[in-house]
């Protein structure tokens, strides 16, 4: 098993390519007016409250904004700007729990400098969905963040008078007209347009003109398209993301190998949603696949909604995986498809080991892992894993047969000489150690396979209790104490010279307000759905 896993890890089986940073973030860095809009949203979210033109003939304000993007847009974000709505109220309540709202709002306003005075006008214009998206898949995956200009942002405003004030007093100068929309250039040299009651921004003047032409035609992205792509996530979210993953993968030369995988090639779109509720923040993810030709055996994790239990250990991140053999078999099938020549060599080496040691690595190792795998990971780098076995006694006999080759496999995986110690009579653990002090101990204890890089964790792992994670669905589950994780992360960052207090003018982040981090993923032939939720202890 170690041999197979080291091979698969070294191959880096699925490389989907760099999808790039957030388009919204790129846009903010390029366009001062868009930055102003985003900061206005930020200050209102912290506060938790808020104060017919050529582009207004769509079915809704969201539809109007989306139609400035091409129908084949690979990426679009819709941000709810209804500052008196439930999402902003919940976000404001959350900032109050950490007692940082005033300080963060001050820093956001300071970042605007001279344009901070425009905040009130912008906030009056908000209320509808603000859309930012990419116009070209190849540019999105290939261009560095600061060089990609292939994006467009739009919002149908509620107060056109407030929007008009952004161009008053020399803040922007007219720069022509396109398809009935007035084009302006702001004091940073960035182009934007006012199309009736819609504000349109873009990465370049050419992109802006193309967006206006797209809106004037019939080939724009629609609300129906966007809703279909985000159907599997919350529709009442503060932020929804639409991704045409299939298009992005096909546009990236780095993803050519990944697309050889049957499951990856079946991926079509994905939706992501960020939702604030009283007492929690949630991120929902839904990846849609074309089920034609797919079976449960083709999935990256085991199919079905049944969720495994996680280890009941505090202070670290606890993961659980139902039927880990499914992941290994998926990885092997993908490796064989991507690089058949290398995989054939791997199979030859595996067959040689099987002949010499009289074992069947698939039957005697991989097929044994048909129960649950539970893993605990600390932020200090210590980890442990416990796997249920079909036949523990048979697995122990297989480990005994593999004693001759384990050192060579470990040296191949680490690239250096290792020490290998077999268990003494009455003991359970094998040990592998490098000259640098790294170690792995493993063995069958009380009927389960235990593997860890720390002897203390290994000693307790077999008898540690487990617990059911509330709301978890699917073969992969995650659980952690969010407060302890945040505290440890901040302490480690401070030890490396980063002090969050310096960024917040001496104020401390109240991590005690955090509760649990819960995550899970469920796979079917129709797609992969999951969620991550952070609860807060203070209601």
Residue ranges and their predicted role:
Residues 49-150, 155-183, 227-268, 273, ...:
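Structural boundary/hinge residues at secondary-structure and domain interfaces
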Residues 157-160, 204-207, 389-392, 454-455:
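Helix N-cap motif at beta-to-alpha junctions
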Residues 11-47:
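Sec-dependent bacterial lipoprotein signal peptides
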Residues 178-184, 424-432:
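Short, hydrophobic/aromatic-rich segments at coil-to-beta transitions
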Residues 184-252, 435-505:
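A conserved glycine-rich beta-strand in the N-terminal activation segment of trypsin-fold
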């Amino acid at each position: 098993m170690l041999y197979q896993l080291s091979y698969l890890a070294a191959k880096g089986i699925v490389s989907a390519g760099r999808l790039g940073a957030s388009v919204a973030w790129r846009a903010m860095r390029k366009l001062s007016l868009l930055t102003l809009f985003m900061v206005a949203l930020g200050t209102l979210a912290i506060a938790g409250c808020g104060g017919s033109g050529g582009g207004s003939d769509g079915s809704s304000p969201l539809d109007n904004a989306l139609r400035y993007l091409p129908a084949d847009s690979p990426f679009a974000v819709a941000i709810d700007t209804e500052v008196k709505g439930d999402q902003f109220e919940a976000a404001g309540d959350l900032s109050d729990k950490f007692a940082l709202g005033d300080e963060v709002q001050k820093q956001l306003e300071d970042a605007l400098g001279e344009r901070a005075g425009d905040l009130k006008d912008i906030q009056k214009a908000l209320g509808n969905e603000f859309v930012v998206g990419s116009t070209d898949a190849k540019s999105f995956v290939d261009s560095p963040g600061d060089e990609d200009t292939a994006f467009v942002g739009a919002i149908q405003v509620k107060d056109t008078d407030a929007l008009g004030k952004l161009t008053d007093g020399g803040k922007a100068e007219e720069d022509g007209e396109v398809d009935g929309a007035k084009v302006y250039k702001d004091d940073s040299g960035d182009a934007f347009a006012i199309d009736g009651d819609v504000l349109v921004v873009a990465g370049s003047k050419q992109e802006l003109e193309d967006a206006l032409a797209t809106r004037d035609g019939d080939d724009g992205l629609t609300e129906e398209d966007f809703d279909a792509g985000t159907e599997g996530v919350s529709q009442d979210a503060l932020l929804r993301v639409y991704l045409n993953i299939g298009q992005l993968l096909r546009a990236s030369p780095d993803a050519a190998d990944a697309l050889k995988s049957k499951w990856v090639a079946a991926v079509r779109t994905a939706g992501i949603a960020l939702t604030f509720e009283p007492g929690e923040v949630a991120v929902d993810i839904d990846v849609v696949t074309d089920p034609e030709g797919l079976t449960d055996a083709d999935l990256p994790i085991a199919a079905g909604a049944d969720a495994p239990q996680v280890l009941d250990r505090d202070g670290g991140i606890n993961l659980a995986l139902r039927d880990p053999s499914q992941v290994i078999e998926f990885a092997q099938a993908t490796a064989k498809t991507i690089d058949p020549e290398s995989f054939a060599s791997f199979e030859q080496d595996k067959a040689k080991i099987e002949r010499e040691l009289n074992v069947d690595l698939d039957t005697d190792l991989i097929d044994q892992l048909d129960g649950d795998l539970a893993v605990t990971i600390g932020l200090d780098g210590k980890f442990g894993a416990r796997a249920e076995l079909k036949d523990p006694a048979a697995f122990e006999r297989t480990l005994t047969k593999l004693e001759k080759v384990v050192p060579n496999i470990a040296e191949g995986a680490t690239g250096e000489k290792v020490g290998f110690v077999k268990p003494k009579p009455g003991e359970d653990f094998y040990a592998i150690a490098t000259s640098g002090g790294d170690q792995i101990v493993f063995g069958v204890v009380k009927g389960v396979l235990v593997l860890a890089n720390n002897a203390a964790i290994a000693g307790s792992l077999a008898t540690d209790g487990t617990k059911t994670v509330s709301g978890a669905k699917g073969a992969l589950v995650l659980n952690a104490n969010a407060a302890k994780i945040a505290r440890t992360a901040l302490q480690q960052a401070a030890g490396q010279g980063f002090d969050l207090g310096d960024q917040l003018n001496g104020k401390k982040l109240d991590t005690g307000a955090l509760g649990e981090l819960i995550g899970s993923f469920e796979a079917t032939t129709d797609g992969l759905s999951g969620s991550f939720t952070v609860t807060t202890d203070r209601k």
